Amino acid sequence: MSKVSIVIPNYNGEKCLRECLASLKKQDYRDFDVIVVDNCSEDASLQVIEESEGELLLEVIPLDNNYGFAKAVNDGIKASGSEYVILLNNDAVAGRHMVGALVNRLEKEPDVFSAQAMMLQYNNRKLIDSAGDYFCVLGWGFARGRDEAASRYTGKCDIFSACAGAAIYRRKVFDEIGYFDENFFAYLEDVDIGYRAKIYGWRNVYEPEAKALHIGSAASGSRHNAFKVSLSARNSMLLMYKNFAPWQKVVNFVPVCAGILVKIAYFARKGLAGAYLKGIFSSFFKMK
């Protein structure tokens, strides 16, 4: 059994998946297997995966529909028997030392649930794509350091949560806190599980010695589109509803309302206010 399982959720990732898998073949740390969970892709993704089967210890889990990110990674995590699980986006390219650096961090710090790699922008490798996820009082989840110089983010630190695009998780903790919430489908499910881990007393950290390039928006399109805006709005509300203590819901009510108004104004300028409001209102039907 491998020390680490690398779970790659995939949906129509033919154009980027080949480079993702090629980067895993070059890792200096070798005690890992790869599990690709395919969300019923309509392109040649499965053919691309087959090309790597002889060079990687590789398993494919084909799903019969596009169930989204959360279910895909959950199925991959449950199929693994490893001590650690790395989640890697299909449009991410792992640096040669990524796997080893992430494993080393969790080995040294037993109170850590997740550790995120330094995610660099694929088309401008001097800029950060994500150096961890934060969640602010306005009810916004956002990527730490995005579009800033990578040279400013070379220090190890604790973060609110790890971006699941390139991060390692201590597998046993999922049995304690639960898996990724499949109601989220996609977006902010990594912030949600990081929040849950913190509630249970676990830490989430940033590991800059592990690096990955990230193309971004490979499955959904541009950074802002109706699909992403609506789902992100809905999931931000669900995240707070699930994880806030009663006193937090009271204290943060006004700041969260202010945050919603700011977002409405912002997305109105992009023609996406309707999508944002649709997401906010749809969240109420998911609250139990």
Predicted regions and their residues:
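A recurrent flexible, glycine/aromatic-enriched loop bordering the glycosyltransferase active site
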Residues: L127-I128, E148-Y169, D192-I193, G221
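A short, conserved alpha-helix in the catalytic core of glycosyltransferases
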Residues: F160-L213
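Active-site-adjacent helix/loop segment of glycosyltransferases
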Residues: N204-K288
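A conserved acidic beta->alpha catalytic loop
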Residues: S23, D38-Q47, N65
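Conserved donor NDP-sugar-binding/catalytic core segment of glycosyltransferases
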Residues: A92-F135
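Short, acidic, metal-binding catalytic loop of nucleotide-sugar glycosyltransferases
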Residues: A22-D31
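Short aromatic/hydrophobic "clamp" motif used to bind/position activated sugar donors
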Residues: V85
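Glycine-rich, basic loop-to-helix element that forms the pyrophosphate-binding segment
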Residues: L63-S80, N90, A101
